[in-house]
Design a protein with these regions (language model features):
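Feature captures hydrophobic
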Residues: 20-169
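Positively charged n-region of N-terminal signal peptides that target proteins for export
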Residues: 1-4
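Bacterial N-terminal signal peptides
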Residues: 7-15
């Protein structure tokens, strides 16, 4: 009897640790943003093209970095998240992903979850998304328009991070 009880406890502990270890970050949570850092830095369109175009070095008041803030419109109580991009070694490198840390973002983008999912799958890009107000945008529009390829890659990045879409945080 003791042996059966011990085996049951061990199997519960193993299954519990596996379920927590395999969990996906909630979409656009601070944990998701941390995973997005790697996705950004592994995308040559984002890292190389945004540096080549001058986007990464065109920073507010010469502060040396860009901040992109994003959130889910249909999750009003969830935190906004930020990605911090710096020019390093000829690339636009994402050095931070997580909770809002800078009160003056360069860009703020928001959309409903189903729209983020569609953009992450490449069902449509930034032009269609903004034209039909599927993606709301605050920031230097002209700068974004000059970087449509990387802007499209950024929207696709939202689909590259394995995510839990079932809750808001």
């Amino acid at each position: 009897m003791k042996k059966i009880l011990l085996m049951a406890i061990v199997s519960v502990l193993i299954s519990t640790s596996n379920s927590y270890g395999d969990s996906k970050p909630v979409f656009m949570s601070p944990d998701w943003a941390k995973a997005a850092v790697d996705a950004w830095n592994n995308d040559t369109v984002l890292t190389v093209e945004l540096f080549k175009s001058g986007w990464a070095t065109n920073t507010k008041n010469g502060r040396g970095f860009k901040i992109i803030e994003i959130y889910r419109e249909d999750c009003p109580k969830s935190q906004h998240i930020q990605l911090k991009i710096e020019p390093k070694d000829g690339k636009a490198v994402c050095v931070y992903g997580g909770e809002v840390s800078d009160k003056e973002p360069d860009y703020i983008m928001w959309a409903k979850t189903d729209r983020w999912i569609a953009m992450g799958k490449g069902e449509y890009g930034p032009m269609k998304a903004m034209t039909f107000r599927r993606l709301k945008f605050d920031g230097p529009m002209w700068e974004a328009m000059k970087n449509m390829g990387p802007f499209s890659a950024f929207l696709l990045l939202t689909g590259k991070v394995d995510s839990d879409f079932s809750s808001c945080h």
